[in-house]
Amino acid sequence: MLGFSFFLFLLMRPRRMQGSQEPCSVIYLGRDNLEKNHDKSLKEWLKTHLIVPPMELISRILHSLFPTSRLPSPDLLGPGLAFFILAALLHTGHSAKVLQTASSAPSPILALLLYTALIPAAAYVSVCIAGSTLSLMETISLMGYASYGHILAMGIPVLFHQEESEIFFFWCLTVFGGLSSLRIILVLLVSVRIPAARLVVCSLVATLHLLSLVFLHFVYMHTTFVYGGN
């Protein structure tokens, strides 16, 4: 009996593998496999959401302005690229404003971070309440690609009219902001399961999307608008 107990003690005692500082015993069997599987799943997730072929990325950006209900596999590369383009655009417009009007506005990067965090969060909460089939990643990808409508609606007036014509901006708002909002609405109409909630959710998300565009334009791109002024 004593010999059998001693044999069990030797079997269960942690041993150091050759060339390793980590103890190894029968208790730790499968630990390396779990770590490898975790690393593999993390790499697959990063590869799926952060690596997009260039032509596929261009196609997704173009399709973000087409009114279609088809939603491609979600990724973060397109929304991330839109974030940096918007940051550069807002900083350019903010630096061109008069000093008195620019100093009253919050930092462009702060406003952009709040926009990036709050708009997708509000959209996701709304679609969850309405019983939508969209996941969080799909919602972030949908709203992120819709930001290219913001880029075109604010960037084209700067290139052609230097923000001198408000009519031209509102025309761009109607075209590019309207197309991106229409695509959001079509995707939500397909994904929301509760018929009575479709109108409310689509109206809310599209309104937030367009109001954020109007806010960013007047606060950071308009040359004479004073944020918080009387």
Label the model's feature ranges.
Residues 38-136:
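Selected alpha-helical membrane-embedding segments in polytopic membrane proteins
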Residues 18-21, 100, 162:
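Residue-identity detector for glutamine
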Residues 1-4, 8-54:
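Terminal intrinsically disordered, low-complexity, charge-rich regions
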Residues 34, 97, 156-157:
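Short hydrophobic/aromatic-rich motifs at helix boundaries and adjacent loops
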Residues 129-225:
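Hydrophobic alpha-helical transmembrane segments and adjacent short intramembrane/lumenal linkers
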Residues 28, 115, 124, 145-148, ...:
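Sequence-level detector for tyrosine residue identity
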Residues 20-23, 93, 211, 219:
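Compositionally biased, intrinsically disordered low-complexity segments enriched
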